[in-house]
Amino acid sequence: MASTSRLDALPRVTCPNHPDAILVEDYRAGDMICPECGLVVGDRVIDVGSEWRTFSNDKATKDPSRVGDSQNPLLSDGDLSTMIGKGTGAASFDEFGNSKYQNRRTMSSSDRAMMNAFKEITTMADRINLPRNIVDRTNNLFKQVYEQKSLKGRANDAIASACLYIACRQEGVPRTFKEICAVSRISKKEIGRCFKLILKALETSVDLITTGDFMSRFCSNLCLPKQVQMAATHIARKAVELDLVPGRSPISVAEAAIYMASQASAEKRTQKEIGDIAGVADVTIRQSYRLIYPRAPDLFPTDFKFDTPVDKLPQL
């Protein structure tokens, strides 16, 4: 809040001829230009983004930026911290010849913890191809939880994993606990515990997941044609409407529907293949399948083209 008020207090640069025009910033030239008349209103504009050139000993290091990372509004100081580069004099090395100052930062411990969590969140999101908006929402959730100190005693990695799970749910692209678990070092049970604690601490909620939330992705990963995906979606929806699967998770119902639809088509998939995609055991699929199998004739869409008749489907 303090940094925002300081920015608001600064005089606003405007074009004298067009005061309402939004100025265009040319960072290469360092100018601020009026788009209406082309007048250069301000010069020597400072670019607060990263400068991706290497200046430290003319060698490319892990982080080759000259002025550090771009501003991060989630950190207390916007991450405008000081970076101490490697020295060249004798005083820069200890008695064993090791550098004393290897990219040290004057950053608070809380900001350092959040930065580490943000990096872990980005890494996890990249592994399961999640877009940037999911990462941003996850970072915001983590910051709220961290500043409230409501989950003391829980590992930051576990909190970050749970925040990622919540962000996916809130953005309408849910992932399973096992999918999040697979890209983190945290157990499914611990992520689940943190998930419940975070919802309570932030007084927020997530929409209930449905079979449709996973159907498209599961079928795509199984390389199933559109007809099978549509049939599986129809089967799962009808099974829920007819109350055939009380107490079963939407994920297991979706997988059972995919198994039934694929077995009735020419593109058959085994229980193991389907289970591997969603991280669910074969027995879980079988339990849900057995519940919907007796009503199989009522579950398929009327225009479905059977390769295997309903009465020939596996009974398990």
Curated annotation (Swiss-Prot):
List ligand-binding residues for Zn(2+).
C15, H18, C34, C37
Region (Necessary for TATA box-bound TBP complex formation), start-end ranges: 244-316
Q: Where are the sequence repeats?
A: 124-200, 218-294
Key word DNA-binding present in the record? yes
PTM: Acetylated. Autoacetylated; autoacetylation at Lys-238 stimulates transcription activation.
Q: Which Pfam families match?
A: TFIIB (PF00382), Zn_Ribbon_TF (PF08271)
Keyword annotations = Acetylation, Acyltransferase, Chromosome, DNA-binding, Metal-binding, Nucleus, Phosphoprotein, Repeat, Transcription, Transcription regulation, Transferase, Zinc, Zinc-finger
> In its UniProt record, which GO terms are filed under biological process?
DNA-templated transcription initiation; protein acetylation; RNA polymerase II core complex assembly; RNA polymerase II preinitiation complex assembly; transcription by RNA polymerase II; transcription initiation at RNA polymerase II promoter; transcriptional start site selection at RNA polymerase II promoter; viral transcription
Listed under subunit, the entry gives: Found in a ternary complex with TATA box-bound TBP. Part of a TFIID-containing RNA polymerase II pre-initiation complex (PIC) that is composed of TBP and at least GTF2A1, GTF2A2, GTF2E1, GTF2E2, GTF2F1, GTF2H2, GTF2H3, GTF2H4, GTF2H5, GTF2B, TCEA1, ERCC2, ERCC3, TAF1, TAF2, TAF3, TAF4, TAF5, TAF6, TAF7, TAF8, TAF9, TAF10, TAF11, TAF12 and TAF13. Associates with TFIID-TFIIA (DA complex) to form TFIID-TFIIA-TFIIB (DAB complex), which is then recognized by RNA polymerase II (Pol II). Found in a RNA polymerase II initiation complex.
Q: What protein name is recorded for this chain?
A: Transcription initiation factor IIB
* Source species of the chain: Bos taurus
Please state the gene responsible for encoding this protein. GTF2B
